[in-house]
Amino acid sequence: MLLAIDVRNTHTVVGLLSGAKQHAKVVQQWRIRTESEVTADELALTIDGLIGEDSERLTGATGLSTVPSVLHEVRIMLEQYWPSVPHVLIEPGVRTGIPLLVDNPKEVGADRIVNCLAAYQQFAKAAIVVDFGSSICVDVVSAKGEFLGGAIAPGVQVSSDAAAARSAALRRVELARPRSVVGKNTVECMQAGAVFGFAGLVDGLVARIREDVKGFSADDDVAVVATGHTAPLLLPELHSVEHFDEHLTLNGLRLVFERNREAQRGRLKPAR
């Protein structure tokens, strides 16, 4: 059983995966709030409580964090509470297997890397990956499995909250599909802007990528896949997205773990 931890700015996904390579699958998944000042002990208590008896069945652990301080605590947690379980964290020096053809590879978020890795492994062709998180990342991987870059926009919830916070006449609203793109009250108007507006933003970015990037035209075989917590809300309004994979990031983490575990076995004791 592989423990996978995906720490983002606002929420953390904890998953358990069984099997390996093409037989691997996510068997359980939890979503908890990210606390930037969380300690290793607090993380251990939370995760051990979630996975229960599977804690004794772990054969490996892997994780990433877009919050550097939390990644440090994840490392300490794994070393102290599961010392015999091999672990691989996505950080500089870890082999991901995907070339980063960008100006500064160190700037590329670990979540973007593993998403593109998982998409390329799953579809075996050029892909555009749309991750709906606190930010919306639209990333591009070539037919050779190279990370070409992408575009980053504010996330749906972040934008909606910012509009409410900076306007006396607006308030925070539930993210839900309104009756129509033409809202009949303030809540519906904000929902229409969030749902239909961001669907249009993503469709527009995908269209521009297909126009501007060689090998991504309408005549080329390109997979467009979405992932992320708010993706299901927008999927019915998206015209450019063909696939949805809820577990794309967790599977990307698994791929990196499998690539690096031989080196880990040489340094760490076997799992209990």
UniProtKB/Swiss-Prot annotation:
Cofactor details (free text): A monovalent cation. Ammonium or potassium.
Record key words, sorted: ATP-binding, Coenzyme A biosynthesis, Cytoplasm, Kinase, Metal-binding, Nucleotide-binding, Potassium, Transferase
Entry-linked InterPro entries: ATPase_NBD, Type_III_PanK
Residues the record lists as binding substrate: G109, A110, D111, R112, T186
GO molecular function, one term: ATP binding
Cofactor(s) named in the record: NH4(+); K(+)
Keyword Lyase: no
Record carries keyword Cell inner membrane: no
Domain of life assignment: Bacteria
Protein localization: Cytoplasm
GO biological process entries: coenzyme A biosynthetic process
Residue positions binding ATP: D6, V7, R8, N9, T10, H11, T12, V13, S134
UniProt catalytic activity: (R)-pantothenate + ATP = (R)-4'-phosphopantothenate + ADP + H(+)
Residues forming the catalytic site: D111 (proton acceptor)
Positions with a binding annotation for K(+): D131
Subunit and interaction comment: Homodimer.
Purpose of the protein: Catalyzes the phosphorylation of pantothenate (Pan), the first step in CoA biosynthesis.
Protein name (record): Type III pantothenate kinase
Species of provenance: Mycobacterium ulcerans (strain Agy99)
